[in-house]
Amino acid sequence: MLFGNKAKKTSIKKQVLITRQTADGIITYSKTCHPNEGILILRGKSSKNEIVVDGLILPPFSVHGPYYSGFPSYDLPFDLSYVGTAHSHPGGSNKPSLEDLNNYYGLVSIIINYPYTYNTIAAFDRDGNHMELQIITALDDK
């Protein structure tokens, strides 16, 4: 049948695991950039059910302001370990803005808002849906 029953699209919810050292790096960098936004590239590995984030990269030629942060992705060296980005929101919310979604890079977007603590870190997929985030002490803990 051409126009009848469409197959239902099932998506697997991925869990994001981030090492405590990496989360501490995001917190410290966000506090350093405050009152401007800061942006970092996340390194790690992805499997069917989870994304493990275990490192950070400072993107070359990144720009920062009170309401924006970004980087030219064409200046990045090719690296298959990039799994997404982390950036800070100096005020209000850690929810992704429309601009955040339009400039999405990778598999996960981690957003942290002021006052930059473990409790203000959140992870989102490409559509802005909340992803479960777990901070682990080391990769052996997962």
What are these regions (language model features)?
Residues 1-82, 90-142:
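Conserved beta-strand-loop surface patch within small alpha/beta domains used
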Residues 85:
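Conserved, mostly hydrophobic/aromatic
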